């Protein structure tokens, strides 16, 4: 191989190594973001279960029939 070809191949290998390093960092960043989002989703799911449970357990006697309520003051 000629000296020029060797230099070109070395430059290409160097470029590929830089790209791989950048991609590895990007993958780590995306993995971290995904992990944080999964924790947030799990927390929100737990909160939704709590709220749904509270709504289901509400005493229905607290809710009166709208027909029994007096009309608003503007009538």
Curated annotation (Swiss-Prot):
It comes from the Bacteria. This is Protein SlyX homolog. NCBIfam families: PRK04406.1 (NF003357). Belongs to the SlyX family. InterPro entries: SlyX (IPR007236). It comes from Vibrio parahaemolyticus serotype O3:K6 (strain RIMD 2210633). Residues 56-75 are annotated as: Disordered. Gene3D superfamilies: 1.20.5.300.
